[in-house]
């Protein structure tokens, strides 16, 4: 018998398939391809099948049957289900073994994980790069006074210094938090991954994380008997952070007033830590050459920080009418301007070491500022290669903060 059939069917339709009417004939089907329900399966088989004792050219009658879903399941799904069930059974056994081998998670471990996640989100909320800069700044200013007066060291003094640094961090956390609360619409465009706009913390939690550090810092200032000057400087830092972000002031909307706010915050931080350090050691306030240098350097460096902070925020600032140096001049021009100002600052530091070799340790001044200047140059060139993408601009601004911290480390040894 000669059987020639062309079958086209899928698991999602009712196919026509040609089969012989005589069930006594031995049929050999060459191949068929069974894939997913969304694909049409075509199989073309052409074979010559003859009985052993019959060599005539007569062919059997061919009957076309309509096979429905039940017929399909018998023809196609049953062979597949054998292998599928076998695989599923093997997978189930392996999965069960893995579950049995896995140690049960204790309640203490789960609670510890939740606490770690919460602390991580809070740390991200307060802008880690600014917090690190404040910690290094405070530590180095106080450490320099201890290096010059090692005989005045005492552990109670270190404890008071740590409490004072916590108070300063309170104002820092407030400034970072209040800015995020009132910039939510802008940050949805500029920084959608921030904890507040991404929904990882609620607005209520954000207010708690913003106001609590400011209040705790103020209480610490009072408990340390810091005096009216340091208390006023702390309040000035809180006021500067408020008028920078909160309507109707929003000094951040103007590049000049924004720079003034940032200058007040950094100058106040620099002066207050130095003044408090000498007062705690029982020393009178003096404008030493090293402190005069770091004050002048950080003041000019604030220009670079103020101009570079909005490089990654151009799109959102333009949409909401916030005028910055970056929106006015563009990311490339601001980068060139800020880099140029900071490079001039480094040149001035090197020149200072050459002109007044007795007032400073010239070798350290020359080498350290040369290294920092070259690192700034290469970082600016790398930013230019990326065509000033928001991510690259953000990294560049954070690198400026690294240079900010590095300058205080240099201050320890000059």
UniProtKB/Swiss-Prot annotation:
Any Pfam family matching the protein: UbiA
Record-given protein name: 2-acylphloroglucinol 4-prenyltransferase
Taxonomic lineage from the root: Eukaryota, Viridiplantae, Streptophyta, Embryophyta, Tracheophyta
Phenotype upon changing residue 183 to A: Loss of catalytic activity
Gene Ontology, cellular component aspect: chloroplast membrane
Reaction it catalyzes: a 2-acylphloroglucinol + dimethylallyl diphosphate = a 2-acyl-4-prenylphloroglucinol + diphosphate
EC number from the UniProt entry: 2.5.1.136
Keywords for this protein: Chloroplast, Membrane, Plastid, Transferase, Transit peptide, Transmembrane, Transmembrane helix
Span of the transit peptide along the chain: 1-86
Record membrane topology: Multi-pass membrane protein
Reported cofactor(s): Mg(2+)
Signal peptide residue numbers: none
Summary of the function given for this chain in its UniProt record: Involved in the biosynthesis of prenylated phenolics natural products which contribute to the bitter taste of beer and display broad biological activities. Catalyzes the first prenylation step in the beta-bitter acid pathway. Uses dimethylallyl diphosphate (DMAPP) as the prenyl donor.
Subcellular location as annotated: Plastid; Plastid, Chloroplast membrane
Tissue distribution of the protein: Expressed in trichomes.
Family annotation (PANTHER family): HOMOGENTISATE SOLANESYLTRANSFERASE, CHLOROPLASTIC
Keyword Transferase part of the UniProt annotation: yes
Transmembrane segments: 153-173, 201-221, 229-249, 256-276, 281-301, 336-356, 359-379, 394-414
Annotated control of activity: Stimulated by CHIL2 but inhibited by CHIL1.
Assembly behavior: Component an active demethylxanthohumol (DMX) biosynthetic metabolon in glandular trichomes (lupulin glands) that encompasses a chalcone synthase (CHS) and a membrane-bound prenyltransferase. Interacts with PT2, forming a functional metabolon. Interacts with CHIL2; this interaction promotes catalytic activity.
């Amino acid at each position: 018998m000669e059987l020639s059939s062309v079958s086209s069917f899928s698991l999602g339709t009712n196919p026509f398939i040609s089969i012989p009417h005589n069930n006594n004939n031995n049929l050999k089907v060459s191949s068929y391809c069974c894939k997913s329900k969304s694909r049409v399966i075509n199989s073309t088989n052409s074979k010559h099948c003859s009985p052993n004792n019959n060599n005539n050219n007569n062919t059997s009658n061919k009957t076309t049957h309509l096979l429905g879903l039940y017929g399909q399941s018998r023809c196609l799904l049953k062979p597949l289900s054998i292998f599928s069930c076998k695989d599923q059974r093997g997978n189930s056994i392996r999965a069960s073994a893995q579950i049995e081998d896995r140690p049960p998670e204790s309640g203490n471990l789960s609670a510890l994980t939740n606490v770690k996640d919460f602390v991580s989100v809070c740390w991200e909320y307060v802008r880690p790069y600014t917090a690190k800069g404040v910690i290094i700044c405070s530590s180095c200013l106080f450490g320099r006074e201890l290096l010059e007066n090692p005989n005045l060291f005492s552990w109670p003094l270190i404890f008071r210094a740590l409490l004072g640094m916590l108070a300063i961090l309170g104002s820092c956390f407030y400034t970072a938090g209040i800015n995020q609360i009132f910039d939510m619409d802008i940050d949805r465009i500029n920084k959608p991954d921030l904890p507040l706009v991404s929904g990882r913390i609620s607005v209520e939690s954000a207010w708690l994380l913003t106001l609590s550090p400011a209040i705790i810092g103020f209480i610490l200032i009072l408990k340390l008997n810091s005096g009216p000057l340091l208390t006023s400087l702390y309040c000035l830092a809180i006021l500067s952070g408020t008028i920078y972000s909160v309507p109707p002031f929003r000094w951040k909307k103007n590049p000049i007033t924004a720079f003034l706010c940032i200058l007040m915050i950094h100058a106040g931080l620099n002066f207050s830590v130095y003044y408090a350090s000498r007062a705690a050691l029982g020393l009178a306030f003096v404008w030493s050459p090293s402190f005069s240098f770091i004050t002048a350097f950080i003041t000019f460096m604030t220009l670079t920080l103020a101009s570079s902070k909005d490089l990654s925020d151009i799109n959102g600032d333009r949409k909401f009418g916030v005028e910055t140096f970056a929106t006015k001049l563009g990311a490339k021009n601001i980068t060139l301007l800020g880099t140029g100002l900071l490079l001039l600052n480094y040149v001035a530091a090197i020149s200072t070491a050459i002109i007044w070799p007795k007032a400073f340790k010239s070798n350290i001044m020359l080498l350290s500022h040369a290294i920092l200047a070259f690192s700034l140059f290469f970082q600016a060139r790398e930013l230019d290669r990326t065509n000033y993408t928001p991510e690259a601009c953000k990294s560049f601004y954070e690198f400026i903060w690294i240079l900010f911290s590095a300058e205080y480390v240099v201050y320890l040894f000059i």
